[in-house]
Amino acid sequence: MLIKKIILLICNFIFLLYADEACGAVVTKTPAYAKSRIEDITGVKIPSDAKMVFHYYNRTSWQENDEQYSVFEFKSEPTEWLMTNSFSDEKNELLKKDLDYRAEKVGVPEQYRVDSLDDYMWLELNGVDMEYIPNKLCLIVYVRIH
């Protein structure tokens, strides 16, 4: 009888562990979650009019090893927001190569990647890379937590 109780407890623990993962997967796909997570980590608030057009999230374990690749589109240039958050227009080839690698790794469609001809502005804070592409009016955000 004791063995049955122990097995039942172990099964319940495993069920709860996977149920948490499944419920978390639904929440992590929302624009509100993506924006909130970026703000929590960096202090940078993504403008409310930015529309999330692509999102990838993967948590590799319950120990918080995860990555997020989100793309937001704007209707017009968020000039004030870019200046307020100190985005740089100096070229950062290392950041660009890193984002290209990550985009390839997670299977990001071509239209949501940085093109080698694109001008861009960038910001890097607390393990979060942000690249704004003016000619596409889009912001690419890559979060990696280890």
Regions found by a protein language model. Give the residues of each.
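Sec-dependent signal peptide recognition
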Residues: 4-12
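Short amphipathic alpha-helical "recognition" segments used for binding
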Residues: 8-9, 43, 108
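Alpha-helical transmembrane segments
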Residues: 13-17
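N-terminal export/targeting and maturation segments
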Residues: 18-84
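Extracytoplasmic electrostatic interaction patches
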Residues: 86-146
